[in-house]
Amino acid sequence: MWSLIPLTAIVLVLVAILHRLFFHPLSHVPGPFLARFSSLYLHSICYLGIEATVLRQLHIKYKTKVLRVAPNSVSISDSEAVGEIYVRGGGFPKDDRYKNFNLGPIVSIFSSLDREYRDVRAKAVAPLFSPAQLRAESGPQGVIGGCIAEFVDQLRKSKEAGIGADLMDMCARLSIDVVTGYLLGQKYGGLQENAHLPPQERQSHKLSANPFIFSIVAFSRFSLLPHRIFQFLYSTSQRLSTNDEVTESFLKLDRFTNNVLEGTTAGEKVSEKPNGGYYHERLISQAGISRMEAAAQSQAVLFAGADSTAVMLATILFHLVQNGAARSRLLCEVRSDKPQDMRFLRAVVKEGLRLGMANPTRMTRVVPKSGPGLRVGDVLLSPGTIVGCAAYNLHHDPEVFPDPFTFRPERWLDDGTDRGLRRPGMEKSMIPFGVGSRACIGKNLAQQQLHDTVVAVIDSEVLEGARTCQERIEIIEWFNADIKGHHLDIKWS
């Protein structure tokens, strides 16, 4: 009898494989052989940080807009499907993968699967992201404008001292100060953290928040795993691999957010309190959440806003260092008689967002079980299927973006100076912040910081004479993009 158990197990496995290959509702969808019956393929490329590149190549190999990447999961590289998946009727629901982005017992605004839970919190803080509110803090006396001025000044000092600068580290310092200063009312102090050190010494001292942020980004390599397995791996990893640097980084961030909630003056008060209060105050007073949750939600927005915006800003500045013609054109526009008509500035930022991708991989959703399914071209995907579009695929579609891996901001111009690069469908293929009701709540703040910083940097001419220390930016394609080596160095000649 015992000898039958292994045989029975083998038969059951073979039956499951045959079902997934030939009888599953997705059996008609092309994809790699292993991916058609096992999730191991998808987990492997996710872990290695090559998911976006591999899936793009497979879409090309199989000549399909719909690619089977796991037994019940597909990748979609058709911008026509974006509206149906993410926008109409609030979009498809998020899948269980997002539970892995919870903050321990706290469900964040981003990770919430419950729309009502998310909406109550998002609506409470939405006024902070209004364009008018952001513009008010973008002048010389505002927190956003003040942080940007300090950022440019530090770049200038590095240039005058004849030393290089790490754009990634500097942009991280700027972003964390903008996010905390504007949303929480106290700056983290990233830009001033090493101000007491000589310029040369500052190069080896990176932002204190980075070790913890990098560890969180890296753990998204496991984000596709079932939640219980993810929890086990996360807790095991915390016990085995956490080092003193990561622990100290976390403790400093934790102390900062606790100080913010306690209303202490440990951080620098940077602006008049906005109507209705700061981010954490609005969550407590208007969403009715606990102080513990408000602290966790504040840490979440700090991480999400500071890290992703830093990556995108560093990407834009990196390409501007390499593109003297773009800098010259921008300078003329910034100093023109009509600076409000910043067409080329908008084009530069858009092109940076296209290449910078804070989230390069699929933003997964579930086809509603109560609906008729999802049709993409001639392919019908049944209810319950996990679907998703990846920014990496859409942003590098050569039919929409000729020369897709090159920084060509002129492609966004509609005044006849696009050099033949402009194509229909570019706007709907751009998803740098996600789309629909679950798009990034902080995208207006990120956009304000990006536009204002580029203007200030170009107007200062601080990038003149600079060169990048590497030819191109390489990213690790986890859920959050991670720039390889965590640095983008420039030097002045």
Curated annotation (Swiss-Prot):
It is a multi-pass membrane protein. It is found in: Membrane. Pathway: Secondary metabolite biosynthesis; terpenoid biosynthesis. Its EC number is 1.-.-.-. The keyword Iron applies. Its cofactor is heme. Heme binds at residue 440. It is an enzyme of class 1 (oxidoreductase). Keywords: Heme, Iron, Membrane, Metal-binding, Monooxygenase, Oxidoreductase, Transmembrane, Transmembrane helix. The keyword Membrane applies. The chain crosses the membrane at residues 3-23, 301-321. It holds the Pfam family p450. PANTHER family: CYTOCHROME P450 (PTHR24305), P450, PUTATIVE (EUROFUNG)-RELATED (PTHR24305:SF156). Cytochrome P450 monooxygenase; part of the gene cluster that mediates the biosynthesis of the phthalide-terpenoid hybrid 11'-O-desmethylfendlerol. The biosynthesis of 11'-O-desmethylfendlerol begins with the NR-PKS mfmB that forms 3,5-dimethylorsellinic acid (DMOA), which is then transformed into the phthalide 5,7-dihydroxy-4-(hydroxymethyl)-6-methylphthalide by the cytochrome P450 monooxygenase mfmA and the hydrolase mfmC. Belongs to the cytochrome P450 family. This is Cytochrome P450 monooxygenase mfmF. It comes from Annulohypoxylon moriforme (Filamentous fungus).
